[in-house]
């Protein structure tokens, strides 16, 4: 028996493999797979349910229906294993062979494989250089094709209609050979000499100049080369033998009532066999040509339907009018093999139930219903029962468990001890959607969840359900405990901030207990310590909010690093003192009670009246943000364990005091301000006035509408301001008898103020006014809802507000689907980015500066570089001293150092610049955000990045924003004023000084920045061309000063030299007209548009030249170019010919069409556009090269822009539509990549003209803008990881000595590796330029065809892979999941490394492989063993 077991173990050993190759199957290969030919369309006998012989379920071909039993029943039982029954021909073996044995059908006529025919581009068409239409006409018997022209004037693969064929037959007889149907295509493919074709095509490529021809030839060449290299033969794309799927994979199940449920494939196979057999008969009978042709065409259609139903013509439908599911449908789509069964499986040892709240649990625990636990832990219980000797067999143990005997519960308790379970809440949007907990057995049927982990799961208790999974093996339990335990996941992997943060009740409780109240019971007491504070509160001698003096003990680290107590008398409140009891040792008291900064006046008052200290107690209560900050500080200072305990204590305390506070909301809590009536009345009066003006024709309809909306918007603001002031403050008398203003104890206000629930905007709707509402099309209705919810809405108001509510619901549904799809694309593109090495050694990276918009620092440098590795030494500003050495990980301490030394730009390592071949290195990635140290090898950073970007997707909006009304008017600014005091610094600004001694800006992208005394950038303002500066570079300014002015409505042309004006080609009535202003009486010259001019004026170009007193041209300083300014159409000149001008004067002005309401694409669609690298509609036009601008000959709708390079290379020309507003003038110098015409910039242009860093910065900043608007924090590095994946392809510019083709797209890594090899051999490496690819395209273009096929467009990916005989090396995560291996990341990283090492060792020492026994030998051995065993028994 032992031998037998050993033998069975050896049988089930799987082959080790390192890769999977896909290719075309030759007819011989198909026959070698097959166990026999299927000749009949019959399936099973309806009476006996036995499979018919030679049919689709034949037992002789596919194996026995019952284990170890032949069909006729002559041989039964294991001992006859391997015998072939002489009566029914069935081999006696296991029935599972019916899942793996294939059959085949010998086709009477060859048939084209529809994938290689119809999947675009058609592979057969490309190879034969025929159009798909022509090939289809041949295949479906509509025309002939010449296969062999012989000595005739016909050409090979020439199409002939029926008549032409007959004519040719008459003319040439059997000199030539023409056929129709798949035979013809087969003959053509066989006749192709690939090597010869490739040689001629390479010849052609080197000679041709036509772009289209080159593209087409390159495509054909690549296809032929891939055929040649892969060993596939082109004629295998035409099938002569059809494989038949094993029957158990296309089951036929009898239902009750004599009907059968069957897989659609059986119907499809039946049609093929029927038609094939009929065709064979017809051919034997030598039937007329037309009949045979029709039958062949039907066979072709039947095989098409079997392989991919509906790909050509109408889909074949079953009895119930729905299309049959073909082989291709089996594997593609959400319900296909890949996504349904390989990537997402259902799991054993799992259960699900509703969740309820478990406020008494510890952070690492969850409550598990006893019933569930008993079911999940069954095998463990059976095992324990047996080892204890309480049950003799498994069966007995099973009985005991079913009876639920008392001892079973005791054993369950033991089994469950320290055995973590995993809880999962769908949708699992990020890795915190599955966490491990220790189960606590509870009565009832609901799982209890710890309140603090709800935000990670995004769970609430309104009926949410969660699934429980049980890690079985020791390794699984270890991973669950060490990596997935809720206590090990305190920080969010997206931003590195705590995700275990109290919310709602807990926040309210903590806020309530840390509030101070004027004149509360016990005010002014002096207490001996926090314990006493708790005593007097419990005894009812003092209120929780009473302001008292209390001795607080803090623990501070001394020189030796030990904690020593430090006792201090502090002005605080009773509640804060009590809260300090749960603070971990080593945390400062100031975190929960920040001391008030003392002013001089305050100190003087206290010296005079010491009893007034009660007025100097901080009135800052702890809100949600503050609590989060405390937890974060605790984690960084005290470590994980203390933080977890502290978080739990905070929660218990919060719940306790929230209950004691008795906070509740009544209708009287929503106090409506008295000023509301007056504000609304005033607004209505203003609206009436505007209406009158409109009726008397003073304002246009559009202006009136905008005005009205403005009026109501500001009225709404005023009402809500009045309401908040009214609600948030109250006056009370303190113990000294003085009145003090304090924050109100109104419940609604407290909830919003603490961050527990609600916001000012919601309170505004409850107690202010609801305000303006939008119509379904997005436009704003001009009559607002003046009522609020407390007053109640009337019918009209209610109806108006339903629009928004309904749109919100529809949006949410759309948003969820869109967001999920974005996450899926992101995961797919980044799935194989894993940390593979410690340091790739690059010194490249990104420059990080604080993000500043106008006067506000949006994101300080500290937040941008925290957790990054420095790429170049950071020098102390103004010196050469190294402050931070290269390759240092910037943690909180280093960031403090940077801030102290006021560094404002740092070059950090980035995933985009990482030089690792596969994956990225730890230094380029930096800190693992969820753990707070340098990232470990094998961390799946790509998936984490994708989850971090995709998870908040549902919070983003779906809509396009319209800026209208107030916002659009605010946009037309005419000056810049500073918010901070500091020193002016101009960035890339060219300027001239005008006669008044002020600087006039003459460059496009100038910025004015304000530096503080330490040299840090505080704010920055963009200065348009022609702005007049009120200050000089380096001048000190005070906050609120105006630093620059400009005219927002016109675009000036500034002269850079002084001189006299001379007009050229300015002819009145032909190129210009004069206009006189009615109000001022001043006349000005207006240049006519080209299309307004007469024919004589079309060619003329109105110009203003500057000449000196002698009439000579004045040159632009520093060049030998004459100062002349060409005037575009509509330009206004207010000077006369011969007038004198100074430097910095405007010679002309171009009126700017007021940029109307621009639509800003926001939210999810914007993020998707960025990651898909879509071209914007009208992108900004960038300068292709650096040089001088001039304008060439104009065409009807476009003007010709010419850039002449300064170094004398070839000029670059470009046609630009007339209506585009150009930012440049003739003769201006531009740098490559500068904006010539405004518009949304295209990421592709930025990459091409400015390089990789700018495009990375652009995408990162644009994506961050969208998320920042919603208040979502995501670390930049996640977006960088995705951008790295978008940049992984390149276009070959010059192939050098490599075997790449010019213009071909290839993986950057592959090219780099090939180049290294070429350089080592002393050959010419290939040159390339990087290409930006959208995430969908990048996913489909991965190295791994398994990963691409399981993403989208399965058919196309597999067709392409098969033709080129691709090998999948199983490098990424998806491929390994699909073949059922550990993924090469996380704990599987070491396993894969070990396998690699083993392979390397094996390659070094090649040993003769011991031949494995063939199946037949193995069966023979087993039969011998069994017989021996039987003999022994006998």
From Swiss-Prot:
It is an enzyme of class 2 (transferase). Mg(2+) binds at residues 460, 462, 464. Transmembrane segments: none annotated. One of its GO terms (molecular function) is zinc ion binding. Keywords: DNA-directed RNA polymerase, Magnesium, Metal-binding, Nucleotidyltransferase, Transcription, Transferase, Zinc. The keyword Magnesium applies. The keyword Plastid does not apply. Zn(2+) 2 binds at residues 840, 914, 921, 924. GO terms for biological process: DNA-templated transcription. Zn(2+) 1 binds at residues 70, 72, 85, 88. GO terms for cellular component: DNA-directed RNA polymerase complex. It catalyses: RNA(n) + a ribonucleoside 5'-triphosphate = RNA(n+1) + diphosphate. Binds 1 Mg(2+) ion per subunit. Binds 2 Zn(2+) ions per subunit. Gene3D superfamilies: 1.10.132.30, 1.10.150.390, 1.10.1790.20, 1.10.40.90, 2.40.40.20, 2.40.50.100, RNA polymerase II, clamp domain, RNA polymerase Rpb1, domain 3. InterPro entries: DNA-dir_RpoC_beta_prime, DNA-dir_RpoC_beta_prime_bact, RNA_pol_asu, RNA_pol_N, RNA_pol_Rpb1_1, RNA_pol_Rpb1_3, RNA_pol_Rpb1_3_sf, RNA_pol_Rpb1_4. HAMAP family: RNApol_bact_RpoC. NCBIfam families: rpoC_TIGR. The RNAP catalytic core consists of 2 alpha, 1 beta, 1 beta' and 1 omega subunit. When a sigma factor is associated with the core the holoenzyme is formed, which can initiate transcription. DNA-dependent RNA polymerase catalyzes the transcription of DNA into RNA using the four ribonucleoside triphosphates as substrates. Belongs to the RNA polymerase beta' chain family. This is DNA-directed RNA polymerase subunit beta'. It comes from Tolumonas auensis (strain DSM 9187 / NBRC 110442 / TA 4). The gene is rpoC.
